[in-house]
């Protein structure tokens, strides 16, 4: 079934009509030319990213120039698995976020995104509600949380030599992994699409089912599929984040940024400008509030939240908060919510 799905997706992109009309502000979609411009910006700003070419001319996408068929970054660290211990109880409360007006896809897809993580409404009370029970079944007083001063310091404890294990490299199985990330352009959805190829601590490629260990919650069943990367001849299975919801989510982020920029301009005119930090760093809170990031619902985003301008240029000279050539920087911030164990910021730290 997965192989058939992969073939269908490949044929969709191969035979879908390519639009060269920009609808970036209206739909969150981009044209091939805008994808190249955004890729050039990403490579210029963050040199860990580079352009890649197809293995053969027959595998090239005609709507993209040779040598700029896809973007790639290698050796991205991933040091922890997304098991039940990754986020404590936070990963146990999940809900499917259906398409609303802001997230309704343009291709007729009827599946939503999974919202996972975040404390439940009763979570902060759990520690205070614990009571002791005697042999007769009578409930005692509520247990009081331990004082930090009463917790013994681990450095004061002596190691028992009998339990020290030999950590010889030949017998040790490390949890460290690295990933190669690829970004291609999908003509059918008119958005970028991310592919991931993982490697174990020994440098050997990860089996496809092992890569799914680094995908958050039910995304692995609903949003992420195993597919062949269309530019490579030797059909290597990679994990791919399906782009059916990319455009509406990106449009929501762009609209929020523009609204915040407008508010900032008004404050500048009245001499009441906020001193908050400018730049992409301010995007983190907004992603945490989106349903796709696992921290909340887009409908609950405070429309008065301030997004700062992505550049440090004079605000009065800016028409929009995020330009089309900066699209992929925001896209990667958004897509990191699907694979939080993979250190995406590592690729943008140069």
Swiss-Prot record:
Q: Where in the cell is it found?
A: Preautophagosomal structure; Cytoplasm
According to the UniProt record, what happens if one changes residue 267 to R? Answer: Weakens acetylation levels of ATG3
Q: Where are the stretches annotated Handle region?
A: 248-326
Any Pfam family: Autophagy_act_C
Gene Ontology molecular function: any one? Atg8-family ligase activity
Q: Where is the stretch described as Disordered?
A: 97-171
Primary location group: other
Show the stretches that span the lipid bilayer: none
Q: What does this protein do?
A: E2 conjugating enzyme required for the cytoplasm to vacuole transport (Cvt) and autophagy. Required for selective autophagic degradation of the nucleus (nucleophagy) as well as for mitophagy which contributes to regulate mitochondrial quantity and quality by eliminating the mitochondria to a basal level to fulfill cellular energy requirements and preventing excess ROS production. Responsible for the E2-like covalent binding of phosphatidylethanolamine to the C-terminal Gly of ATG8.
The record's note on quaternary structure and interaction partners says: Monomer. Interacts with ATG8 through an intermediate thioester bond through the C-terminal Gly of ATG8. Also interacts with the 40 amino acid C-terminal region of the E1-like ATG7 enzyme. Also interacts with the ATG12-ATG5 conjugate. Interacts with HAT1.
Q: What is the protein named?
A: Autophagy-related protein 3
């Amino acid at each position: 079934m997965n192989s058939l799905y992969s073939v269908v997706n490949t044929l969709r992109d191969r035979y879908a009509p390519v639009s060269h009309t920009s609808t970036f502000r209206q739909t969150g979609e981009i044209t091939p030319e805008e994808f190249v411009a955004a890729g050039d910006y990403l490579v210029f700003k963050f040199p860990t990213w580079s352009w890649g070419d197809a293995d053969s001319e027959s595998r090239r996408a005609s709507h993209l120039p040779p040598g700029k068929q896809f973007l790639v970054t290698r050796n991205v660290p991933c040091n922890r698995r997304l098991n039940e211990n990754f986020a404590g109880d936070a990963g146990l409360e999940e809900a499917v976020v259906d398409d609303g007006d802001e997230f309704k896809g343009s291709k007729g897809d009827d599946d939503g995104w999974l919202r996972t993580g975040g404390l439940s409404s009763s979570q902060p009370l759990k520690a205070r509600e614990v009571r002791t029970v005697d042999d007769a079944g009578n409930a005692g007083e509520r247990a009081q949380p331990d004082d930090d001063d009463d917790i013994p310091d681990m450095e004061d404890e002596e190691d028992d030599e009998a339990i020290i294990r030999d950590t010889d490299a030949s017998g040790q199985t490390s949890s460290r992994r690295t990933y190669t990330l690829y970004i291609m352009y999908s003509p059918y959805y008119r958005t970028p699409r991310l592919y991931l190829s993982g490697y174990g601590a020994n440098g050997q490629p990860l089996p496809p089912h092992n890569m799914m260990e680094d995908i958050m919650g039910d995304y692995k069943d609903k949003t992420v599929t195993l597919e062949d990367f269309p530019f490579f001849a030797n059909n290597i299975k990679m994990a791919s984040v399906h782009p059916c919801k990319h455009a509406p989510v990106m449009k929501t982020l762009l609209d929020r940024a523009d609204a915040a920029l407008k508010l900032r301009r008004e404050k500048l005119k009245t001499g009441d400008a906020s001193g908050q930090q400018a730049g992409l760093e301010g995007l983190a809170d907004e992603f945490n509030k989106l349903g796709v990031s696992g921290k909340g619902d887009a409908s609950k985003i405070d429309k008065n939240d301030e997004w700062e301008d992505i550049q440090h240029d004079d605000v009065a000279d800016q028409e929009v908060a995020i330009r089309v050539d900066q699209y992929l920087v925001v896209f990667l911030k958004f897509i990191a919510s699907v694979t939080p164990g993979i250190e995406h910021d590592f690729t943008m730290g140069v």
